[in-house]
Amino acid sequence: MMKCNSIGSILFLTLGVMLSALLPCSGQQNAELPADATVEPSRTIPIMYISTADGKPIVSKEEYKRATFYITDPAKEVSLGTATAPLEMNIRGRGHSSWKADKKPYRLKLDEKLSLLGMPKSKHWALLKFWAPTMAGMKLGELIGMAWTPSTRPIEVVLNGEYIGLYLLTETIRIAKSRVNIYEQPDLNEEAATIPGGWLVEVDNYREDNQIRFRENDRWIINITHHSPKRLSTAQKEWLTAEFKGLNSDIYAPDKATSRWEERIDVDAMARFFIIQEVMDNPDGFHGSFYLHKDLGEDSKWVAGPIWDLTCMNREKTDYTFRMTASYVFAPHWIGELLKDDDFNSAVGKVWQEVYPTLSNEWLNYLEKCFAPYEAAYRQDKLRWAEAGVTTQPLHSVAEKLTTSLRRNVDWFNAHLPATPNAITPVVLTTDSRHIVYTMSGEVVRISDDYDEAIRDLPQGVYIVGGHKVIVP
């Protein structure tokens, strides 16, 4: 028998039941939100039609859902499947912070290897939110000579009969002949001779189960997520931990002239990776989505890349990007130490001399033209996900602003190459002048010489700053 001593309590409970029936339950929080579901595709570029087997939204990032798909193309060049004869696949959500948005990103696993929109055959693909810096950055990676850079193509998407906007259909990062083309080490490998090769890892800013962690320096922890192999034997985990602790020690060696990090890392590839992050002005460059891979072989080294998750700050650069993000929550791993090494700086200068003409001509010319075909699709996407009171710019304005920023970044970097008279001199802050933000477990999440900047926009939680507890509600 319910014990309730007031009519008000009964009304409160009744109202709660009524509201719970009207609002999404916790298991539905990641369902697609309606926004303006009456908007139609522009039909000016290819459209992917996806239908889940049960007709329901994709709400999980862990569990795949059976689905079918087909692609129509107004130019009739890359159509695939039909409405009456669709192709089979699995689909799930993907991403970290991007999964929390109304417009969701997805991971696709086809039943058979197929070429989508002219890209090399594979079963594995991603649908990412359309983002102009991603298109610009992937083209940059291709032109600058990374070992492999994911291809990406704009496409409109209709899910279960509802238009969900403009996406980038993108190759996912994985070991394969047409992608990261190296030996693939099996999970739970115990064979000592093959453990040192066939690795695909990521310096990550998120905690994952398939990860090793250790203290990089006295300021922050480094997370190394092992994507392949994903499940490690004791021998594999011990080797990977020792390998990266050794590599970290070499990078932080006080005497850079005798440091041995170059015996472990491909210097040329790291120089190219650094240039991409600087030209893009990508604040995430060295603390998340920082991939490395290593083939099997006596002389194999860790190779930086592939690139992923690129952005552009659209600001006036006054320093190297990783230094301009001093108040950012996550740490720029290794790059500050690498720039103290003359060999690395020389490698950066050599690569820049090679790629600068291409960047200042071919890349910037590409940026001035590449977005025009997607103007109508971009407009429909913005109508589909319109926010009340928010005015959005047309794609040509977004592209013009991005191109202007990237051209300015190219010019700035050309005038401030490492180890040249115009290079920026590092500013070393003494401990007394710094405000260091610690988690309750002792990890450093931010360092700033200004207290307000140190605590600005911290995620919800409890922190220690200057010996005092700071609670962010």
PLM regions and their residue ranges:
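Short, well-structured beta-strand/strand-turn elements
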Residues: I144-E156, N282
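Internal "kinase-insert"/substrate-recognition segments embedded within catalytic cores
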Residues: E112-S115, K129-W131, G145-P150, E162-I275
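C-terminal outer-membrane/trafficking sorting elements
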Residues: A423-P473
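Boundary at the C-terminal end of the N-terminal hydrophobic targeting segment
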Residues: A21, C25-Q29
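Low-complexity, Pro/Thr/Ser/Gly/Ala-rich linker/spacer regions in secreted
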Residues: Q28-E40, L417-D432
